[in-house]
């Protein structure tokens, strides 16, 4: 499980102890407008395909520092992969004897659901 401390703040929001904070959603009360910030979309990547009781599995290789692998209770796998580089990168996933290749766009965050 994960707890996101500041889900919604005003622009240039501060914590209760006065430190500047980021939030998933910024709400400007003067304009009555909500802005969905990058953290919101990262949370969406994780919360949508990864189901309750999923298990995080080990991962290795050149993209391991920027990738996570989960097995959902239904047997599907979820790969979450971040490409911090400006150029495309190939991600190769080997699961149950099968080799799959994905091209990650530069500076992108990716969610892949792999069915058995």
Spell out what each predicted region is:
Residues 1-2, 52, 75:
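Loop/turn elements at helix/coil->beta-strand transitions in domains of secreted/extracellular proteins
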Residues 1-41:
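Aromatic/acidic polysaccharide-binding cleft in carbohydrate-active enzymes
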Residues 5-7, 57-61:
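Acidic carboxylate-rich catalytic motifs and surrounding loops in phosphoryl-/glycosyl-chemistry enzymes
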Residues 13-16, 90-93, 114:
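Short conserved micro-motifs at the rims of enzyme active sites and ligand-binding pockets
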Residues 45-48, 59-96, 107:
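Carbohydrate-binding surface patches
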Residues 50, 54-56:
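Edge strands and adjacent loops of beta-rich recognition modules
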Residues 98-101:
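Surface-exposed loop/edge segments in extracytoplasmic proteins
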Residues 103-116:
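C-terminal beta-strand-rich structural cap/linker in extracellular carbohydrate-active enzymes
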């Amino acid at each position: 499980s994960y707890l996101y401390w500041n889900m919604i703040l005003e622009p240039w929001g501060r914590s209760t102890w006065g430190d500047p904070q980021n939030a998933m959603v910024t709400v400007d009360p003067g304009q009555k407008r909500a802005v969905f910030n990058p953290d919101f979309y990262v949370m969406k990547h994780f919360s949508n395909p990864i189901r309750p009781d999923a298990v995080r599995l080990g991962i290795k290789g050149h993209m391991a520092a920027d990738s996570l692998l989960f097995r959902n209770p239904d047997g599907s796998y979820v790969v979450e992969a971040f490409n911090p580089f400006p150029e495309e990168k190939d991600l190769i996933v080997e699961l149950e004897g099968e080799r799959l290749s994905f091209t990650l766009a530069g500076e992108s965050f990716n969610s892949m659901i792999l069915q058995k």
